[in-house]
Amino acid sequence: MFALDSIVGKHINYALDKTQHLPNKINNSITNTEIILQDYQYFASRIFIGLKNLNSMLLFWDTGTGKTLTAVYIIKYIKELFPRWIILIFIKKSLYVDPWLNTISSYISDTSNIKFIYYDSTSSLDKFNNIYRSIESSLNKKNRLLIIIDEVHKLISRSVKKDNSERNFTPIYRKLIKLANYENNKILCMSATPITNNIAEFNNLIGLLRPNVMNIKEEYINNGKLINFKEIRETLLGICSYKRLIEADSLTDTNYIDGYAKKSIFYHNIIMSDEQSKLYNMAERYDYKTELGGLKTMRRLISSFAFYDLKIKGDLDNVEYNEMIKRKLAEFSEFTKNINFSKEFINAFKNNEIKTKTDLLITDINNYNILYQYSCKYIEACRIILNSRGKVLLFEPLVNFEGISSLKYYFNCFNISYIEYSSKTIKMRDNDLNYYNNYENNDGNKIKVCIFSYAGSEGISFKCINDIIILDMPWNESELKQIIGRSIRLNSHEYLPINYRYVNVHFIISYSNNRKSVDKEILDIIKNKQGKINVVFDLLKASPIEIIHNMYKYIEPVDNEIIFETIRKTRMKEMNISNVIINLKLYPITYCKDYDRATILKGLLNKDTNIIYDNDTPVAILLVDNNNLPIFVIENDILIYITNDYY
């Protein structure tokens, strides 16, 4: 295995030699300032630009680590490899102005060769189909193509078969493969979470980056690990650049480290009112009868908000149903206009003292009980917000009646200031966001809350957030990571005192009075999905250019490129599924990675080799001092060994 690693290492050094003249900074022509790239940004850019035959790369970098700026740097300097390029950038439509257009306009003077395609817009995809032939015919000795795909997991998920049926996006996916692998073209994909749902997405991602080299099946996973891991890894060497300061997933606490805020997870288990529980049970029966029952649609709606006489859709057509929703929202708006809780009641509510205080206004108590009857979630969200010392983000994917529209009335009742970042606020949301992120609002004194839907779940940065509330669960951990990543980004808390550099993540899990919960069901789905996804993530994390370079930093570079052309044409060997039993004496230990001391892990140590195992797979190796003794720290009376990655 390591013979191939060393050859790739020689190619990396070849690229570094070839690009040593490239600057490590990029000039912002609008502000007339220079931005110095981080070492990892500069390194990945030079490898991608410096190796002609490395036609594809995945930037598997955490949220907030500068993927967009790195892509713009590559666009600016790829002419060092060849003078004439067509740049095709695939993005979500909502990310066009910020960050993409703003960043490109700041650093690149001539943008005439850059074309944007929105992969979440039918008309934009039609445009791509129309220009596909002209792009294909223009690729010759005079022109080359660079394809950049932002948040590539969004594009890949649209290409995976659903119920064994081909998706509408599949023909475009095939065209991208053809264009990307045309001689001398390049493709750069970017994502903090490149796989979101299943192994099929991983195969399609690899199919885009290195077509036909592999096809992993779920039966290749044994006890949470890939069999023949090393052989599979060889087909992926150098396929990605990997950057993560904190390895923990979205559901794990982390400490403050290297500019990233501390993260603490809180679960709020709350009980619906009898009326909300009754409607929830109706919704459950409705979901089971419909084709979309697997999406748990009605239960999710009712778990958020259940107006007292709002019944399940039944036989209403869409027009009738939407008209009913408008009427109910108008009724609820009219009802809440007269609610303005007193300061005494709000203080009692914050401190969970409503039942013990005897001097509260009866009107406040009655109004509170009615609001709780409609939504235990919104009530709990208001309590969390009122107890937060600083700014709060609230994720609510539902924009209409059972979501943001009704939630805002609760905020009005409790005198909570807010802005909304959703598909309904396109004209004003960027200005509102700038005001919310303004230095004078670092503690939320002017605007306390930003409510955001999926429109703000990726590519948007929030500053100085202390609490984030998840009102409705996404379907996978990758989306959850993106959502939480809006609040924890590199240096996002630098203007707060050190003791305020934290984010509390609140999951509100609502239960009916007979202990049923769609929130808990989806949370369990997230955990089950992530187990398989972590298997292929481990594969990517074992093969990036950084690990190979660290192993062979001082090896002589090659004279000419050869290896990536060979790897792209070498298909993975058939899997050997036979069981091989090796007996090792292992000892349970607690450890952390040297580059991520915030995440504490459990493992099994082989004292003879200093290798740490997770089940039967080596995952780390002890760091030792000059006397060959393990390096460790003691925190809270726990001995924690310091390690590096095994690969």
Curated annotation (Swiss-Prot):
It catalyses: a ribonucleoside 5'-triphosphate + H2O = a ribonucleoside 5'-diphosphate + phosphate + H(+). SMART domains: DEXDc, HELICc. The gene is NPH1. It comes from the Viruses. GO terms for molecular function: ATP binding; DNA binding; ribonucleoside triphosphate phosphatase activity. DNA-dependent ATPase required for providing the needed energy to achieve the termination of early transcripts. Acts in concert with the RAP94 subunit of the virion RNA polymerase and the capping enzyme/VTF to catalyze release of UUUUUNU-containing nascent RNA from the elongation complex. NPH-I must bind ssDNA in order to exhibit ATPase activity. Keywords: ATP-binding, DNA-binding, Hydrolase, Nucleotide-binding, Transcription, Virion. One of its GO terms (cellular component) is virion component. Monomer. Interacts (via C-terminus) with RAP94 (via N-terminus). Interacts with the cap-specific mRNA (nucleoside-2'-O-)-methyltransferase. This is Nucleoside triphosphatase I. It is an enzyme of class 3 (hydrolase). One of its GO terms (biological process) is DNA-templated transcription. ATP binds at W61, D62, T63, G64, T65, G66, K67, T68. Its EC number is 3.6.1.15. Residues 467-533 are annotated as: Binding to the cap-specific mRNA (nucleoside-2'-O-)-methyltransferase. The lineage of its organism: Viruses, Varidnaviria, Bamfordvirae, Nucleocytoviricota, Pokkesviricetes. It is found in: Virion. It holds the Pfam family Helicase_C. A motif (DEXH box) lies at residues 150-153. It comes from Choristoneura fumiferana entomopoxvirus.
